[in-house]
């Protein structure tokens, strides 16, 4: 019997914080963690297809270097020596970056994206590039499979990042979020996923979907791990004009302070709309009730101008995506998936006046959200992350049978997520139970700009009362 230092069945189930503690106590090594992750990739990849590229030798070399640095007393922080997945739209020097598209097939950047550079500076081990929808916008082919139900949608566009962390082949992963693409797979995979405040994490070197809506953030198994990852990747970046200058705090400093006196708002009319299924409704109401029992103040509110946001988000995203891809569409249009190409071309037909009108509507919405937080003295807003658990891949674009308005699952999935992209405020999804079919359910907290620490504090308090985050889809490993 191998001991905990080398037994991969022990190592892969450690959280980032647990693995970091073992590294510093000499109970394991970065090399052992990395070998365990690579073994898990080999065991699960044929089933779930989470990775686009696995640079195993580079990862092993980095792990040996991490061990040598730690032995010499050069401790880079809590991610030092920890295997992390990176969404394949983030540039990685000397490692192929394809963004899920034949358009970029074989492309090897000559520099790292800032988020990858920050991970490297923190001593993290890039275990692999995770699969995503084409340019974080189109299709996911060949499809990444949900480890909870192989014929169901695992969420996207940070598809592989969510699945990799779920099957324990990475301890955490980087995702991106333009309308929900971190929080959707986090909810579907029983993970913690954070979309930080706009500009909190640099998007330099990340393939653009929508300049004014894109966010880069962490996906992890626990709230504490998420706080540790955000602390490592958040910074001001002179290479990114949208990067914020706000100082980066220690996100773990007040994480255990509890929720007594914390004010959490809910607009039940909006967040519990008819598309929310009973299992999700009950799970979310349970979170609200438990937080109230812990001392939080639950405040009934009305969200502002919500009828503006769907059109605003889609218009801005379509125009900015088509602008970014205009030259590539003309030069390599035949290499795009037809669905992606058609969607991008549609964005070119949107009048400039309509785009500007939507930008102005977004600013009115942002102002109204800020006023709501100030007027009601809110620390967060709460909702389900997803109105329903994941659907079968074959049903994603079919009208839901439980609704009479023709809404498809893919439209339902962004109902609660896209407003945080428009508002630019931070939003986190965390586990809160399972459906009657055994599928994960997540709840969402949206906070004040640059107050990710409060979201971690609330989510950590709830996490301590349950073991939801510890449950995993063991059938995938059989």
Predicted features and spans:
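Structural helix-boundary/capping segments
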Residues: 17, 43, 121, 125, ...
């Amino acid at each position: 019997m191998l001991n905990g230092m080398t037994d991969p069945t022990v190592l892969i189930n450690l959280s980032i914080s647990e693995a970091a503690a073992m590294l510093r106590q000499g109970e394991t090594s970065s090399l052992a963690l990395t070998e365990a992750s690579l073994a898990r990739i080999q065991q699960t990849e044929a089933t779930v297809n989470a990775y686009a590229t696995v640079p195993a030798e580079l990862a092993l070399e980095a792990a040996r270097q991490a061990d040598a640095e730690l032995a010499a007393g050069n401790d880079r922080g809590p991610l030092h020596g920890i295997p992390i997945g990176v969404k394949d739209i983030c540039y990685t020097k000397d490692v192929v970056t394809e963004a899920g598209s034949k358009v970029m097939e074989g492309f090897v950047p000559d520099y790292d994206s800032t988020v990858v550079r920050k991970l490297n500076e923190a001593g993290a081990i890039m275990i692999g590039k995770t699969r995503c929808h084409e340019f974080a916008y189109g299709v996911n082919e060949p499809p990444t499979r949900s480890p909870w139900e192989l014929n169901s949608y695992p969420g996207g566009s940070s598809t592989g990042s969510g699945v990799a962390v779920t099957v324990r082949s990475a301890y955490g992963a980087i995702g991106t979020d333009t309308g929900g693409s971190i929080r959707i797979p986090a909810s579907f995979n029983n993970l913690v996923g954070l979309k930080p405040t706009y500009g909190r994490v640099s998007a330099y070197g990340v393939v653009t979907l929508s300049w004014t809506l894109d966010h880069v953030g962490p996906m992890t198994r626990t709230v504490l791990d998420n706080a540790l990852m955000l602390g490592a990747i958040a910074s001001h970046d002179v290479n990114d004009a949208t990067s914020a200058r706000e100082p980066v705090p220690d996100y773990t400093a007040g994480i255990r302070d509890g929720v007594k006196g914390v004010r959490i708002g809910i607009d039940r009319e909006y967040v519990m709309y008819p598309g929310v299924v009973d299992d999700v409704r009950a799970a979310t109401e349970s979170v609200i009730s438990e937080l109230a029992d812990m001392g939080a103040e639950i405040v009934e509110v009305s969200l502002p101008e919500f009828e503006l946001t769907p059109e605003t988000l889609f218009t801005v995203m379509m125009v900015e995506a088509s602008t970014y891809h205009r030259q590539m569409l003309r030069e390599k249009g035949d290499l795009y998936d037809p669905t992606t190409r058609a969607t991008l071309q549609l964005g070119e037909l949107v009048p400039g006046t309509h785009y500007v009108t939507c930008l102005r509507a977004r600013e009115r919405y942002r102002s109204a959200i800020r006023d709501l937080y100030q007027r009601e003295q809110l620390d967060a807003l709460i909702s389900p992350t997803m109105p329903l658990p994941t659907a079968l891949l074959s049903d994603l674009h079919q009208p839901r049978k439980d609704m009479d308005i023709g809404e498809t699952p893919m439209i339902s999935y962004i109902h609660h997520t896209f407003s945080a992209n428009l508002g630019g405020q931070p939003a986190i999804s965390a586990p809160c139970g399972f459906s009657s079919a055994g599928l994960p359910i997540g709840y969402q907290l949206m906070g004040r700009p640059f107050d990710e620490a409060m979201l971690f504090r609330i989510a950590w308090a709830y996490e301590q009362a349950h073991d939801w985050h510890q449950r995993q889809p063991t059938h995938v490993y059989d």
